[in-house]
């Protein structure tokens, strides 16, 4: 599972988003079920914690050019924004709850991430 995510191209927002959406199309329902159980099952909570740490580091690596030149609070805030935009719940909201197509979900994420690029 992580091998597929690790194949995301560094610095290529559209490519990284396509990789991520592909991952969520395949694994998203499973991840959402796990997240729904994390408060009740210790081993699931541990697995989810590992996944959260992995996702943070994936964002730092994959979107490194968007983080270059930022330090301290600004870097943490930008990373947190990227983590939120690329979270499985964001995919679920756009794809499942709001009914966007896969292509429109990808376009929306690319556009939103692009907004962070110009942020101070």
Question: Where are the model-predicted features located?
Answer:
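Short helix-capping/turn signature of helix-turn-helix
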Residues: 36-41, 85
């Amino acid at each position: 599972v992580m091998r597929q995510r690790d194949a995301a191209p560094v610095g290529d927002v559209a490519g990284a988003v396509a990789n991520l959406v592909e991952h969520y199309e395949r694994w998203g329902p499973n991840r959402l079920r796990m997240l729904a159980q994390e408060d009740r099952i210790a081993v699931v909570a541990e697995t989810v914690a590992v996944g959260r740490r992995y996702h943070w580091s994936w964002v730092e690596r994959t979107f490194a050019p968007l983080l270059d030149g930022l330090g301290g609070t600004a870097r943490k805030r930008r990373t947190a924004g990227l983590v939120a935009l690329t979270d499985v719940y964001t995919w679920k909201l756009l794809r499942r709850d709001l009914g966007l197509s896969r292509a429109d979900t990808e376009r929306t994420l690319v556009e939103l991430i692009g907004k962070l690029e110009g942020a101070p």
